[in-house]
Amino acid sequence: MEYMKGPATSSQGNILCCQCGIPIPPNPANMCVACLRTQVDISEGIPKQVSVHFCKQCERYLQPPGTWIQCALESRELLTLCLKKLKANLSKVRLIDAGFIWTEPHSKRLKVKLTIQKEVMNGAILQQVFVVDYVVQAQMCDDCHRVEAKDFWKAVVQVRQKVLHKKTFYYLEQTILKHRLHQNTLRVKEIHDGLDFYYASKQHGQKMVEFLQCTVPCRFKASQRLISHDIHTNAYNYKSTFSVEIVPVCKDNLVCLSPKLAQSLGNMNQICICARVTSTIHLIDPSTLQIAEVDGNTYWRYPFNSLFHPKQMEEFIVMDTEIIRDRKQAAGAGMRSNKHVLAEVWVQKTSEMNTTQQYHCRTHLGHLLNPGDLVLGFDLSNCNLNDEFINKMNPHHIPDVVLIKKSYDRARRQRRRNWKLKEMDRDREGMDTDDERQYQDFLEDLEEDELLRKNVNIFKNANVPVESDTDEEGAPRISLAEMLEDLHISQDATGEEGAGMLTE
């Protein structure tokens, strides 16, 4: 019986390593791996210790030649930055893998494990794993260096208003906070007649100027100063200054218009009250309820000033009122206000209660005033006015008294005010003793003007209890629907204490 033989199996023979003599599978180098590594180091030329620069102030890393980037520890961006440090040396090998080895955050060391391949003797491919140690060295970036040297700003916006109070700047502060335009501001400096906003770039300063032009009537002038010049790269370093001037007219100011401007506004009376200042000046004629708006360009063509300072307002008591109904509108007259009621009133100064002197006038506050109420206004009959337009008017067309607004108990209004406003961090040149009273005047303006509140974020004040409506005396108040919750970082959305923040 014959047995068939199976196919012969071929097996690869071993060879002896030319260095140590141990049997190994054949390879182009005729060496074992251990001897090959002792003879050839494919990581030769790749530095095993490299330095990276880190700015402690802004927590950014330097990416040569002059770029600073934000990278988290063991992030992909930081790994890319570390590999770029070895880019020239890694060009001769093939990078297979790279990753971080964990180190203590305070050790100032970054360790990266690299896996590389390279063709060595006679076409043999050798793979090697090694660690590169990165030493984190502290270096201040140019931006932080300018901050520490107090020479960090590239543009400044100087906002000025030629008035004796700061209510306009309190309003601007709230609108800036609402639109978050203060985030790019390096520094805000408060001086006696305005605010200075400092920026790191000219574009941020231009953005602030555009915002101011949309918020209040103003005009500006731009200038720049050459700081340095590089003759090799033809690079210029400028500092830009934007000087913004706001119109010197505010809410509750009594003004006298020029005859040409009054005629262009619908044959309006020259003596008017500034009811509100937004992007335009809102005027109302207290004797006819005619209203008009004056924008910034029109104001600078036909400028007018306030006849009185707010401190010159006097307190009157209403003796009698009579509503004027069905008043005919003259031909060519402008629009009339639907929120006010025209009335004739007899008033007497509270400082002259022991006399019989009374004043008769027309007012736009007919919907608010009743006999016995207190009202604030200006006495034109017993004052010396120095204004070019009012001096040319017929004295018979000048009223004796102009009433501005109803007076309420200020202490009571402050006590029941259950809301508050945010404030910007700013450097104060000097605190005026009258600043607190001016700030209270601004808060009262917010309570009295609903349209003004639309541009302001109002927050609930949990420390002040809400009074019942039975204590209401008629003073305007802000409803709870208009207030926002004052949510802090340490609270969650339900108002409870949230998780604590991790700090170093």
From Swiss-Prot:
InterPro entries associated with the record: Nmd3, Nmd3_N, NMD3_OB, NMD_SH3
Annotated signal sequence range: none
Key words, A-Z: Cytoplasm, Nucleus, Protein transport, Transport
A GO CC term assigned to this protein in UniProt: cytoplasm
Subcellular location: Cytoplasm; Nucleus
Pfam families in the cross-refs: NMD3 (PF04981), NMD3_OB (PF21192), NMD_SH3 (PF21193)
Gene Ontology terms for molecular function: ribosomal large subunit binding
Record keyword Transport present: yes
UniProt key word Zinc: no
Any one biological process term the GO annotation gives: ribosomal large subunit export from nucleus
Function noted in UniProt: Acts as an adapter for the XPO1/CRM1-mediated export of the 60S ribosomal subunit.
Family annotation (PANTHER family): 60S RIBOSOMAL EXPORT PROTEIN NMD3, NONSENSE-MEDIATED MRNA DECAY PROTEIN 3
Subunit structure: Associates with pre-60S ribosomal particles.
Family per similarity comment: Belongs to the NMD3 family.
Protein name per the record: 60S ribosomal export protein NMD3
Recorded name of the encoding gene: nmd3
